[in-house]
Curated annotation (Swiss-Prot):
Protein name: Putative 15-O-acetyltransferase SAT12
Family: Belongs to the trichothecene O-acetyltransferase family.
Low complexity biased stretches: 7-36
Misc remark: Trichothecenes are sesquiterpenoid toxins that act by inhibiting protein biosynthesis.
Gene field: SAT12
Cited function: Putative 15-O-acetyltransferase; part of the satratoxin SC2 cluster involved in the biosynthesis of satratoxins, trichothecene mycotoxins that are associated with human food poisonings. Satratoxins are suggested to be made by products of multiple gene clusters (SC1, SC2 and SC3) that encode 21 proteins in all, including polyketide synthases, acetyltransferases, and other enzymes expected to modify the trichothecene skeleton. SC1 encodes 10 proteins, SAT1 to SAT10.
Entry's Gene Ontology molecular function annotations: acetyltransferase activity
Matches recorded under Gene3D superfamilies: Chloramphenicol acetyltransferase-like domain (3.30.559.10), Nonribosomal peptide synthetase, condensation domain (3.30.559.30)
Disordered as annotated region, ranges: 1-40
Enzyme class: transferase
Length: 573
């Protein structure tokens, strides 16, 4: 099942709560490998002291007009050369528009508006056009981030035209992305994706056909994770609003004449220079918590998971939508049972754990030792102190981890009639406890900022997933036992998609140029990890499993995702 598929889940689909609860607590047992916590987790990795001056912008030795800096933090992780060249962790956001009555529009005209909008956006916020280069570090696989300005207006226009692609096609967004991946794999030497490509597509005869009122137009944003983190989704809304304003004012044929070169002064300042707390003021408490988070992150690859296959596969997403009515019931149940400080993100993470235990039960031999370290990305921007006129869309990612020792003990107790709800209560409380611990410790941000080359070199075996090309080496995952397990550990709460873009797009005149039918995204997974992302749209909860079909089948992926949704629904019965 591809990401355009959406199977609503409604409480009317099953007859009664008791039968539904029974249906999601039983599963035929499966054979599992020993994935228990080792007695000796290994020596603590000591990271070198960071010097902010090592990571500042400076001229590229080969061309002084080009500025560059060393990658740091999560940039180093997602920027490992081979992985980035294959598109590991490239992500997308798809905005579905419907043309309003107040607009004479074609795909060609729409492109001109987006080209102008892109030039304006880059001049104001040049970091959106940075790119990665490799080969200057001692560790050749780690990148530098570079920025190069334009020498002429025509060069700027050519860049923007190359960024914006229009297609008159009946293909879906997932099919268009699959086409691009196929072409990429056909290259003799795979190349990293552009920082950002935008495909504007509609099911019309040609690019100059009028887009009649009510026509669906998709804007597909394709991001290279080296340059963007999840906040890049907000740029999609910014650019659509810019283009809407340009169309409303009929200025799409008037290209800007910016003073290129001046924008360099507006590049995002290096992370270490704008951290809320200076590195040299960190004390023993920081060192202790830092070590704890580091060791926790290193245990992720040893955690319990789902059975793993190793075949060539495709990056896919399964999107499971819960009806608005049922989503409201789930939200109300969380508040009623857990209190106002809890949200559906805590419940969703808890339900993911139960689904994992159901789809791969822990055998008696490891009941006391199997564990789960579940990482989650955290927005690091609250830990920065900087005055900005434009958003920081580049990587500013912190980290946290939910730790569940003796994982089997967190499962559903069969002797309790309310076993599902009680288990979800306990897990949600533990999830929130661990969330709060890391979110109230600046350590989470310090750690990601400290992901230097030395750490990446040590941790790449755990964090880097094997590529599923036919000739790829077959490496072990987790403890390396006879039964490998997929990295199904992470849960990401993306919040409300409504916070990214409004339901309608208006120009300065007040005219409604577009309705916004949908806004959704996903991440390309080329290796043996997988994770659940949760968001809402029009108050309906959506669960998206990002995975690779070479690791486990669509049937297993669908079963796992459906069970997460069913556990969340069971909480409201």
């Amino acid at each position: 099942m591809l990401d355009d598929d959406c199977s609503p889940t409604s409480s009317s689909e099953m007859s009664n709560a008791s039968s539904r609860e029974a249906s999601i607590t039983s599963r035929s047992s499966s054979t599992s490998g020993n994935n228990s916590l080792p007695e000796d987790r290994g020596a603590v990795v000591q990271l070198p002291t960071l010097n902010p001056s090592d990571y500042r912008w400076h001229p590229f030795p080969g061309d002084s007009s080009v500025l560059q800096r060393k990658a740091i933090g999560v940039e180093a992780l997602v920027g490992i050369r081979d992985a980035n060249s294959r598109g590991e962790y490239d992500f997308y956001n798809n905005i579905v528009l419907r043309v309003g009555n107040a607009l004479e529009l074609t795909l060609t005209r729409l492109k001109r508006a987006f080209v102008k909008a892109m030039l304006d956006a880059r001049f104001e916020n040049p970091s959106i056009a940075c790119y990665g280069v490799w080969g200057q570090n001692k560790e050749q696989y780690l990148p530098h981030i570079q920025y190069k300005s334009f020498k002429s207006q025509s060069e700027a226009l050519a860049w923007a035209n190359n960024c914006i692609i229009i297609q008159a096609t009946s293909l879906t967004g997932s099919e268009l992305r699959a086409e691009r991946l196929k072409k990429r794999r056909a290259q003799a030497v795979p190349q990293p994706s552009n920082p950002l490509d935008i495909i504007i597509y509609a099911d019309v005869a040609n690019q100059r056909n009028r887009l009649e009122p009510g026509t669906e137009v998709n804007i597909l944003f394709l991001f290279n994770h080296l340059i963007w983190d999840g906040k890049g989704r907000y740029f999609t809304s910014e650019l659509v609003q810019r283009a809407t304003t340009i169309l409303d004012q009929e200025k799409e044929n008037i290209m800007p004449t910016h003073r290129w070169g001046e924008e360099k002064s507006r590049l995002d300042p290096p992370i270490l220079d704008v951290m809320l707390v200076n590195l040299d003021k960190m004390g023993p408490d920081y060192d202790l918590a830092h070590r704890k988070l580091l060791n926790s992150q290193l245990q992720v690859g040893l955690s319990w998971g789902l059975p793993l296959t190793r075949n060539p596969g495709e990056p896919l997403q399964i999107r499971h939508c819960i009806s608005r009515e049922d989503s409201t019931k789930i939200t109300d149940a969380v508040r009623a049972r857990l209190g106002p400080k809890y949200n559906i993100g805590h419940l969703g993470h808890a339900a993911t754990v139960l689904s994992l235990l159901k789809n791969n039960p822990i055998p008696p031999s490891t009941q006391d030792t199997a564990f789960l370290f579940s990482p989650l990305p955290v927005d690091g921007r609250p830990y920065l102190l900087e005055e900005r006129k434009t958003p920081r869309y580049g990587n500013a990612q912190a980290a946290a981890v939910v730790e569940l020792q003796k994982l089997a003990s967190w499962g559903i107790k069969s002797d309790n009639l309310n076993g599902v709800k009680v288990a979800l209560d306990d897990l949600a409380k533990k999830v929130k406890e661990d969330y709060d611990y890391w979110l109230t410790n600046l350590v989470a941000w310090r750690f990601k900022s400290s992901c230097t080359s030395e750490f990446i070199a040590f941790g790449s075996a755990i964090y880097q997933t094997p590529y599923l090309d036919p000739g790829a080496p077959k490496v072990k995952v987790g403890t390396g036992t006879s039964t490998d397990m997929v990295f199904l550990k992470a849960f990401c709460n993306d919040g409300r998609a409504e916070s990214i873009i409004a339901y309608t797009m208006h120009g300065p005149s007040g005219k409604e140029l577009f309705q916004v039918d949908d806004c959704f995204g996903g991440v390309d997974v080329l290796g043996s990890n997988a994770f659940i992302r949760m968001d809402t749209w029009k108050d309906a909860i959506r669960l998206t499993l990002c995975y690779n079909s070479g690791c486990f089948s669509d049937a297993v992926a669908n079963s796992f995702t459906t069970d997460v949704a069913q556990y969340m629904l069971a909480y409201s019965w």
